[in-house]
From Swiss-Prot:
Database matches in SUPFAM superfamilies: P-loop containing nucleoside triphosphate hydrolases (SSF52540)
Residue ranges occupied by any Helicase ATP-binding domain in the UniProt entry: 80-256
Renumbered ranges of motif Q motif: 49-77
Record carries keyword Nucleus: yes
Region spans: Disordered: 1-32, 494-531, 686-803
Domain notes: The Q motif is unique to and characteristic of the DEAD box family of RNA helicases and controls ATP binding and hydrolysis.
Biological process terms in GO annotation: rRNA processing
Compartment(s): Nucleus, Nucleolus
Listed Acidic residues bias regions: 715-730, 786-795
Protein name: ATP-dependent RNA helicase DBP4
Family matches, as PANTHER family: RNA HELICASE
Keyword set, alphabetical order: ATP-binding, Helicase, Hydrolase, Nucleotide-binding, Nucleus, Ribosome biogenesis, RNA-binding, rRNA processing
Gene3D superfamilies named among the record's database cross-references: P-loop containing nucleotide triphosphate hydrolases
Length: 803
């Protein structure tokens, strides 16, 4: 017997390699045991309450234990055993009942038993989600459960990320969580991405994925997938259409519905109410509700992204006292992730959202779900209200219904087992924000434009609804609704106008009498040939703002009519709405000097301002023109030039330079006489001014002389004061002065002179000599400056100048 850990070789086997070999053997044994246990599993007769009762692998058990999942929910108790056996499943359960784990666990276990691991194995499971947020949430749950020992390579495919980086990593993936659009893009464009070995296909929120919105993408994806696979479908409102099931190639699917026999299709802990609220009172009611629920977590649903943005921006300016957030499909992916993270972690917050947040998202502890706009159908209502009352937690849902929507919507809710009770709003608690919205829209054109787009998108969504019994557009008071948004007038809706024109056209056709068939039809006039020069002269100037923006921002309900004449003077037949570009200012070539400041030359959306002091009105048709009204300097250029007037002795005004008429000029006499008179008058004026100038100069000279004498007198008095007579004390002043001078010299000698700075290593004696010579020359120059008095001084001066 050899030593432990020693093989036939002389060197011992590495401990790490030996451990990996032993682990591989244990995995093979575990897989065999799991296969046998799953074969003996009986989903129909067996009772399974805990996850420990199921034949699961150790990594999955550790992941469930780490996430504190021990007891299975109703949908998990029925769906997981069937999925482990390899059956196709149609799973339906209420919102918040744990459907995500119902397909995450079978995906991990089935691939683990098949040992579908590694880059060579290829893609084993594909999970499709209708929204990016739900896909991210599923991927997070997959990572939490599978990170405790599973060796699968999992990936997330959603829009908004680098396509090239995903393309490089795709061939190594074993499990993918994706949205249909991104998945189809890689299947059609990434050559190295193969799905021939796919074992499982999972569709979360399957009814939404299989509807018209994703029909083409899903059909194209299924064409790439192999026919032999396991398919799992889960949703709160499951589809049983034979056409949908045939598209997915399901083989004897098991329909699992744990709440089909319940009295309600929604959780029992969910309290559901509805309010009869006309369109014009919806925002007032919503604002009052938010003011009364500042300590709650609220989720508000609208039908369009424009409505979400408008309500968010307007409410944010009014500061309701609770954090506001908004999410919609037109946001970038980073902003959407930040919003969902903030709302999930917040205790008190209000999130305005579209249906992008209606399915699958798990926001913890949501107190209220408010549906301001009526949902498209009952399934949408169930998914929206399912964001609260999750995992047996209490929650409340409030639905706003217009009077015309009440009867039809309640009938459909009752048919789907959704109990809803009516409640009333106290009028004392309701606050009107109509005036505040009007003020904000007046001050901020961008907010006004956003409100108009919100109005149009809401009307369009109602117009396109299939259920005309619930959504009756004629029953809505659109003018009052537009006023409640703060808009000065009702925006024009193009498709409504087209419907009216079609009705008028059909009515007129019925009243027209059919002419006799024998009558010959009048020959149609041939259209004239239009050259490129004709098209060039028919061009219109581009406006500063887009056409649709100006149409919406213009106040009032009046139609914008087309200009009366075109460039050539002929009458136009198309209205302003049919033109691609509107005419900003059109000037005919023959009438260049005409006045075009009137209202006829104003472009759609423009206005005319009459300025005081200006003969021509100012046309405001752009932001630059609007800012011009605030600049006094620029406005003065538009004013008429003023005239300076001079008044005569009688008080009559005259211009500074007035031209005489020929008759007045002749009445004054001959030109030679007038010239002589002018010269004499000018000479008198000059002589008078000369006398005044001489008197002024004489006075200045006298004043200058007086000031000089005063200054000399003051200097003489100062010299007299300084001459002080010395007192005779009998002492010799000269001797005292010499003694003091000798004493000061001794003191100066005793003072220690400062030490001279030491030389550096790079300095030489020549530098000191040069400095001393410079000082001598400087001293000599200072001595030269003094005025010489004797012959010696003059010689010193000459020597200094010469050298």
């Amino acid at each position: 017997m050899g030593a432990p850990g020693i093989t036939g070789r002389t060197r011992p086997t590495k401990v790490k390699k030996q451990a990996s070999q032993q682990k591989r053997k244990r995995d093979d044994v575990d897989v065999e045991k799991l296969e046998q246990a799953v074969t003996e599993l009986d989903p129909k007769t067996g009772t399974y309450n805990d996850f420990s009762d199921l034949p699961l692998s150790d990594p999955t058990k550790q992941g469930l234990k780490a996430c504190h999942f021990a007891v299975m929910t109703d949908i998990q108790r029925k769906a997981v055993p069937l999925a482990l056996k390899g059956h196709d499943i149609l799973g339906a359960a209420k919102t918040g009942s744990g459907k995500t784990l119902s397909f995450i666990i079978p995906v991990l276990e089935n691939l683990y038993r098949l040992q579908h691991v590694g880059a060579d194995a290829g893609l084993g499971a594909l999970i499709l989600s209708p929204t990016r947020e739900l896909a991210i949430q599923i991927f997070d749950v997959l990572c939490k459960i599978g990170k405790h020992g599973h060796m699968f390579a999992a990936g997330l495919l959603i829009g908004g990320k680098s396509l090239e980086s995903e393309r490089q990593a795709l061939p190594r993936m074993n499990i993918l969580v994706a949205t249909p659009g991104r998945m189809l893009q890689h299947l059609s464009q990434t050559a190295a991405f193969l799905v021939d070995d796919l074992k499982m296909l999972v569709l979360d929120e399957a009814d939404r994925i299989l509807d018209m919105g994703f029909q083409r993408d899903v059909d194209a994806i299924i064409d790439y997938l192999p026919k032999e696979r396991q398919t799992l479908l889960f949703s709160a409102t499951q589809s049983k259409k034979v056409s949908d099931l045939a598209r997915l190639s399901l083989q004897d699917p098991e329909y699992v519905s744990v709440h089909a026999e319940d009295k309600s299709a929604t959780p029992k802990s969910l309290q559901q109410n509805y309010i009869i609220c006309p369109l014009e009172e919806k925002l007032d009611t919503l604002w009052s509700f938010i003011q009364a629920s500042k300590k709650s977590k609220i989720l508000v649903f609208f039908s369009s992204a424009k409505a979400v943005r408008f309500v968010y921006e307007s409410f944010r300016h009014m500061q309701p006292g609770i954090p506001l957030l908004h999410i919609h499909g037109r946001q970038k992916q980073g902003a959407r992730l930040d919003t969902t993270a903030k709302f999930s972690s917040a205790k008190n917050s209000c999130l305005f959202a579209t249906d992008v947040a209606a399915r699958g998202l798990d926001f913890p502890a949501v107190d209220f779900v408010i549906q301001v706009d009526c949902p498209d159908d009952v399934d949408t209502y169930i998914h929206r209200v399912g964001r609260t009352a999750r995992y047996n937690r209490e929650g409340r849902g409030v639905l706003f219904l217009a009077p015309s929507e009440e009867e039809g919507m309640l009938k459909r809710l009752e048919a789907k087992k959704v109990p809803v009770e009516a409640i009333n709003v106290r009028q004392k608690k309701r606050q009107s924000i109509k005036e505040q919205l009007q003020n904000m829209c007046f001050q901020d054109p961008a907010l006004k434009y956003l409100g108009q787009k919100a109005f149009m998108t809401y009307v369009k969504s109602v117009y396109l609804q299939k259920d005309k019994e619930v959504f009756q557009l004629k029953e809505y008071d659109l003018e009052a609704f537009a006023a409640s948004l703060g808009l000065p007038g009702t925006p024009r809706i193009k498709f409504l106008k087209d419907d009216n024109s079609k009705q008028k056209k059909q009515a007129s056709r019925q009243t027209i009498e059919v002419s006799d068939s024998d009558e010959e039809e009048a020959p149609k006039a041939e259209k004239p040939v239009r050259t490129k020069y004709d098209r060039m002269f028919e061009r219109k100037n581009q406006d500063v703002l887009a056409e649709h923006y100006k149409k919406l921002v213009r106040d009032g309900d009046e139609e914008i009519s087309a200009p009366a004449n075109d460039f050539s003077g002929e009458a136009t037949t198309n209205g302003a709405d049919d033109d691609f570009l509107a005419i900003k200012r059109r000037i005919p070539a023959d009438d260049e000097d005409e006045d075009f400041g009137g209202e006829a030359s104003v472009a759609p959306g423009g206005r005319v301002v009459h300025l005081a002091g200006a003969s021509q009105p100012l046309i405001i048709d752009s932001n630059r023109r609007e800012k011009l009204l605030q600049s006094k300097k620029k406005l003065t250029k538009l004013m008429d030039r003023g005239k300076k007037l001079v008044y005569d002795d009688d008080g009559n005004p005259h211009e500074v330079y007035e031209l005489e008429t020929e008759a007045d000029f002749k009445a004054k006499g001959l030109p030679e006489h007038q010239r002589q008179k002018f010269i004499e008058a000018a000479r008198e004026v000059v002589q008078t001014a000369d006398v005044e100038d001489k008197a002024t100069a004489r006075a200045k000279r006298k004043e200058k002389l007086r000031k000089r004498k005063e200054r000399e007198r003051g200097e003489a008095e100062d010299d007299g004061d300084e001459a002080v007579e010395l007192e005779d004390t009998g002492e010799n002043p000269l001797a005292n002065f010499l003694a003091d001078a000798q004493y000061t010299d001794d003191e100066q000698e005793e003072v220690e002179q400062p030490k001279k700075k030491e030389k550096k290593w790079f300095q030489s004696d020549s530098e000191d000599e040069e400095k001393s010579s410079k000082k001598k020359r400087k001293k000599a120059k200072q001595q030269v400056v003094e005025e010489p008095e004797t012959l010696e001084d003059m010689e010193a001066l000459a020597a200094g100048l010469l050298g």
